[in-house]
Amino acid sequence: MALDESITSRDYLYGRLLAVAEYIERTALDAAGEKRPTNAERLMQRFADHPCDTWRQIELQLSPYEQRLQGSSRAGLLFRARKTLDAIMNQFQGDDFKAPGKLSGEFLLGYHCQLTSLYSKSGDDTPKENP
């Protein structure tokens, strides 16, 4: 299944957010030659159980990686990724973003579809492997 930007379910949107965060951090780590799991990867289980609180943590942790990209030849990539994050956030309906409750498996669909889309648009459809 390809990315469907018209899907506005809470779980799908949260998965998409996680994918964009993963993409930003992975791009910055790869550019620096660092081989380690991203915060999005490390916090995926917690994210599935407590998405709103965990998203806050993940987004705040993106700042140093965004700064790395901003001062590099990949600043355009960062601009597009931030624009995508903003567009996804704008799709949440009412109180869905802060609604309590775990995410269903649908968040994984949103995550993988968004990640595939990001890597195919960047021309690098083979993300680096983690250790």
Per-segment meaning from a language model:
Residues M1-P131:
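Intrinsic-disorder/low-complexity detector
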